[in-house]
Amino acid sequence: MELDKIRNLSDEELKVEDNKAQEQLFRLRFQMKMGQTEGVKKLRELKKDVARIRTISRERVLAIRGAAPLAESSAPAKTKSRARKSKKEAL
């Protein structure tokens, strides 16, 4: 599925397409294990489609919630050499 088509889908349609692609992927993997098909190219395309759909879905979730909070504080941490100097000065 093309990226433009995926971006134009609603959230509900994205979920439906994700479920369809997952089911097709399951069936294709099962057929490959049973030796009924050699659809390696189709398997690769389905995996990429699932990744595209989930990426677009995740982008929408993050846009609603805003940016992720920063993990570190803005104040610089003391280095070991500064800590040692302050201990020596205290004595």
Curated annotation (Swiss-Prot):
A single cellular component GO annotation: ribonucleoprotein complex
Pfam family, one: Ribosomal_L29
Keyword list, A-Z: Ribonucleoprotein, Ribosomal protein
Renumbered residue ranges of the record's region Disordered: 67-91
Residue ranges with Basic residues bias: 79-91
CDD domains from the UniProt entry: Ribosomal_L29_HIP
Superkingdom of origin organism: Bacteria
InterPro entries noted in UniProt: Ribosomal_uL29 (IPR001854), Ribosomal_uL29_sf (IPR036049)
GO MF terms held by the record: structural constituent of ribosome
GO BP annotation list: translation
NCBIfam families registered for this protein in UniProt: L29
Protein family: Belongs to the universal ribosomal protein uL29 family.
Protein name according to UniProt: Large ribosomal subunit protein uL29
Organism: Acidobacterium capsulatum (strain ATCC 51196 / DSM 11244 / BCRC 80197 / JCM 7670 / NBRC 15755 / NCIMB 13165 / 161)
